[in-house]
């Protein structure tokens, strides 16, 4: 669920880091359209696409098991859609960490008018 996703992000990037990714670029936060602005925004685009492929439960609400082992996110013994959601969140949190140097403060709270290009397909 989104709370667990936030904990994954904070675990990879430090306490309260999740706030950097709420309303960032064209895809981080609720909804999304246009072309991702940078590698960080692309992490959110890929995460949105991943959630869109999940069947059988609500990715934003379903609770799955996971843990941190030596700084790595490890999805637990989830089945079906819970496993899929955990993997979506794990990959995105790792993506934010791998691309933290692309983070651009100018894309925080970006106006939706800057995201009007034709949206990419997943």
From Swiss-Prot:
InterPro entries assigned to the protein according to its UniProt record, in alphabetical order = PLipase_A2, PLipase_A2_Asp_AS, PLipase_A2_dom, PLipase_A2_dom_sf, PLipase_A2_His_AS
Residues bound to Ca(2+) are 27, 29, 31, 48
Annotated catalytic residues = 47, 89
Which cofactor does the UniProt annotation name?
Answer: Ca(2+)
A single GO BP term for this record reads: arachidonate secretion
Entry's EC annotation: 3.1.1.4
Q: Which domain of life does the protein's organism represent?
A: Eukaryota
The free-text cofactor remark is: Binds 1 Ca(2+) ion.
Q: Where is the signal peptide?
A: none
Going by the record, the broad EC class of this enzyme is hydrolase
Q: Which family does it belong to?
A: Belongs to the phospholipase A2 family. Group II subfamily. D49 sub-subfamily.
**Which PANTHER family does the UniProt entry name for this protein?**
PHOSPHOLIPASE A2 FAMILY MEMBER, PHOSPHOLIPASE A2, MEMBRANE ASSOCIATED
The identity of this protein, by name, is Basic phospholipase A2 vipoxin B chain
List the source organism.
Answer: Vipera ammodytes meridionalis
């Amino acid at each position: 669920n989104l709370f667990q996703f936030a904990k994954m992000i904070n675990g990879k990037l430090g306490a309260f880091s999740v706030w950097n990714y709420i309303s960032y670029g064209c895809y981080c936060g609720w909804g999304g359209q246009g072309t991702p602005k940078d590698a960080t925004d692309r992490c959110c685009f890929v995460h949105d696409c991943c959630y869109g492929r999940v069947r059988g439960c609500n990715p934003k609400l379903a609770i799955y098991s996971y843990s941190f082992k030596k700084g790595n996110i490890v999805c637990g013994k989830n089945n079906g859609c819970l496993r899929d959601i955990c993997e979506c969140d794990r990959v995105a949190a790792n993506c934010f960490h791998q691309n933290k140097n692309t983070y651009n403060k100018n894309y925080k709270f970006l106006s939706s008018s800057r995201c009007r290009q034709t949206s990419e397909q997943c």
